[in-house]
Regions:
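Long, well-ordered core segments of solenoidal/helical folds
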Residues: 62-88, 120-140, 168-186, 208-238, ...
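An alpha-helical repeat/solenoid feature that recognizes helix-turn-helix modules
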Residues: 88-114, 138-167, 188-211, 237-263, ...
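Short, solvent-exposed mixed-charge patches
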Residues: 381-386
Length: 386
């Protein structure tokens, strides 16, 4: 979800802020993290879900052109992507936006050739170098609030550094210092379900055990995928009230490990609910021109191997044809309405970084994933650990 929720709360908006892990799974994730080549994501066949996956109706050439166009927008942001300065000077979650920036480039790398990857890595090198400071590696001594805001992004950035082939020796040493604090009840008890899943997932990518398993988290009150609320009845024009939609998308990200496994811990009833909700929500967000939410729902369908839904093809077509002139994604009117509330409480907020960057990144992921992910195998029933 685009950032700005804290600012919108202060502006008086109402709403809510946004064990199935086997040793074998942890080993697989650690092996992925250890690989310094961006090709690892497509290195093995994805396991199919109960619904047959069809090759998405996304025009490859248009998607490639859109990714190339997005490079112009990402390059224009380069001077602003300094996580320490974003927090100090703009009151923004600098590590979060740094990760969103690297993640967007990662998608472009994964659909490009080796020569393009080398060029992008060289471009990113001086930006990555901005993080080799004590001010960036500050979480061992940070306040509880800053720690809570930054730790998931901090772990994710280390994984991304490794994937791009940057040295992570110091980074891993700094992470080792804070793992006990990450796993302490004083921290984990303050996290929501999807955030805790994210922490467990990233720690396993970095070779650490600990924390609750996915299925323990799945059984907790409030898990959207298990509780089956009707998300279409939310006030979907209110960025905070629609937060359960993002809770669902993020639960699916981690329960599928971004498409690497079937939906863990879930029953066929849960899968039917997820399929129905995505089919119902996508047309709503298309009408509202809410590209950010739309892209995350498409990402889910990619990971769930549910690209046979007609709403999937419609949403992909909308995304590929609604790129902004500067290469970004995000409806100007939709983001402009949110910006009014955000800028009232934080005049230093950078809209291009805080809003358009996230939407651009998730749209790239939604469109590019089918181009680099392996073809799905025969449809099989997912493992349902109840």
């Amino acid at each position: 979800m685009c950032d700005g929720r804290d600012e919108m709360r202060r502006a008086g908006k109402s709403g809510r802020a946004r064990g199935g892990n086997s040793r074998a799974g942890a080993g697989r994730l650690a092996a992925c993290a250890a690989c310094a080549c961006l090709g690892w994501c497509a290195a093995g066949p994805a396991t199919a879900q109960s619904h047959p996956a069809t090759q998405p109706a996304v025009d490859r050439e248009r998607t490639f052109r859109a990714a190339r166009h997005a490079e112009a927008f990402l390059r224009s942001l380069a001077p602003k992507i300094d996580p320490v300065r974003l927090r100090a000077e703009h009151r923004m979650k600098g590590k979060k936006f740094y990760v969103e920036y690297l993640s967007a480039w990662r998608e472009i790398c994964l659909v490009g050739g080796e020569s393009e990857r080398r060029v992008i890595r060289a471009f990113l090198a001086p930006i990555v170098a901005r993080t080799d400071t004590d001010a960036y590696h500050n979480l061992a001594d940070s306040s509880d609030e800053e720690f809570k805001q930054d730790v998931i992004s901090y772990l994710n950035a280390c994984v991304l550094h490794g994937e791009f082939g940057f040295d992570t020796t110091r980074y891993r040493r700094e992470i080792a210092r804070i793992v006990p604090r990450i796993l302490a009840p004083a921290h984990l008890d303050r996290r929501g379900i999807d955030n805790t899943m994210a922490i467990v997932y990233r720690l396993r990518q970095l070779g650490y055990e600990g924390g609750p398993g996915y299925c323990e988290l799945f059984r907790r009150p409030g898990c959207v995928v298990r509780m089956h609320p009707d998300l279409t009845q939310l006030d979907l024009d209110n960025p905070l009230a629609k937060q359960p939609v993002y809770d669902m998308t993020h639960e699916i990200f981690y329960l599928t490990e971004f498409g690497r496994t079937p939906l863990q811990c879930a029953s066929e009833k849960d899968l039917r609910y997820v399929r129905r909700m995505h089919a119902s929500l996508l047309p709503i967000f298309i009408r509202k021109r809410d590209i950010d939410a739309m892209a995350e729902l498409v990402m889910d369908l990619n990971y769930l191997k549910m690209a046979d839904l007609p709403e999937y093809a419609t949403a992909c077509e909308f995304l590929v044809t609604h790129q902004n002139e500067d290469g970004s994604w995000g409806d100007r009117e939709h983001i402009g309405n949110m910006a009014k509330a955000i800028l009232q409480v934080n005049p230093n907020y950078l809209l291009d970084v805080g809003q358009y960057l996230h939407t651009t990144g998730v749209t790239l992921s939604a469109l590019c994933y089918p181009l680099y992910a392996s073809a799905a195998g025969p449809a099989t029933r997912p493992s349902a650990v109840r």
